[in-house]
Amino acid sequence: MPSGLICVARIGAPHGVRGAVRLWSFTADPFAVSDYGPLVTKDGARQFEIASAREAKSHLVVTLKGVATRDEAERLNGVELYVARDKLPPTEADEYYHADLIGLAAVTTAGDALGKVVAIHNFGAGDIIEIAPPSGPTLLLPFTNAVVPTVDLAAGQVVIELPNEIEGDTPNHPEA
């Protein structure tokens, strides 16, 4: 993938017979995806411009310039769309693009290495940070200020306050 690109949307199934497609936008404002100019595929080989967009249940329905039939739309199902990083707005304090977090080292508040950030997920109840340790299963933790008190992009790391359940601490009540 050409460097400096950020994934902002994924094309879904066709909608209707005139080439419209379902589009899942990964931007805070779903309609902002049409403000960034031409969107490109992961390999940079194809470029798309959004001609129109309207809101649907959990996605947008868009028409793309040059896509006029259902058959053309069907061939685009699953294509991820990217935009050059410099076209995105700057982040606010304590906001990050997921792409900036992937690959950062994860350390505990005591400075012990945990692994690397491999993904940020959102299953509907807030962001989840996925950390891959050098061995063993990955850790899935809430991406909150309580669990991730520090994100230091310049140092290339996130600091993790492991919940007691993960640290293996004993409960605060005696066993009966």
UniProtKB/Swiss-Prot annotation:
<dbReference type="GO" id="GO:0042274">
    <property type="term" value="P:ribosomal small subunit biogenesis"/>
</dbReference>
<keyword id="KW-0698">rRNA processing</keyword>
<dbReference type="InterPro" id="IPR036976">
    <property type="entry name" value="RimM_N_sf"/>
</dbReference>
<dbReference type="GO" id="GO:0043022">
    <property type="term" value="F:ribosome binding"/>
</dbReference>
<dbReference type="GO" id="GO:0006364">
    <property type="term" value="P:rRNA processing"/>
</dbReference>
<comment type="function">
    <text>An accessory protein needed during the final step in the assembly of 30S ribosomal subunit, possibly for assembly of the head region. Essential for efficient processing of 16S rRNA. May be needed both before and after RbfA during the maturation of 16S rRNA. It has affinity for free ribosomal 30S subunits but not for 70S ribosomes.</text>
</comment>
<keyword id="KW-0143">Chaperone</keyword>
<dbReference type="InterPro" id="IPR002676">
    <property type="entry name" value="RimM_N"/>
</dbReference>
<protein>
    <recommendedName>
        <fullName>Ribosome maturation factor RimM</fullName>
    </recommendedName>
</protein>
<feature type="domain" description="PRC barrel">
    <location>
        <begin position="92"/>
        <end position="166"/>
    </location>
</feature>
<dbReference type="GO" id="GO:0005840">
    <property type="term" value="C:ribosome"/>
</dbReference>
<dbReference type="InterPro" id="IPR011033">
    <property type="entry name" value="PRC_barrel-like_sf"/>
</dbReference>
<dbReference type="InterPro" id="IPR056792">
    <property type="entry name" value="PRC_RimM"/>
</dbReference>
<keyword id="KW-0963">Cytoplasm</keyword>
<keyword id="KW-0690">Ribosome biogenesis</keyword>
<dbReference type="InterPro" id="IPR011961">
    <property type="entry name" value="RimM"/>
</dbReference>
<dbReference type="GO" id="GO:0005737">
    <property type="term" value="C:cytoplasm"/>
</dbReference>
<comment type="similarity">
    <text>Belongs to the RimM family.</text>
</comment>
<comment type="subunit">
    <text>Binds ribosomal protein uS19.</text>
</comment>
<dbReference type="Pfam" id="PF24986">
    <property type="entry name" value="PRC_RimM"/>
</dbReference>
<dbReference type="InterPro" id="IPR009000">
    <property type="entry name" value="Transl_B-barrel_sf"/>
</dbReference>
<dbReference type="Pfam" id="PF01782">
    <property type="entry name" value="RimM"/>
</dbReference>
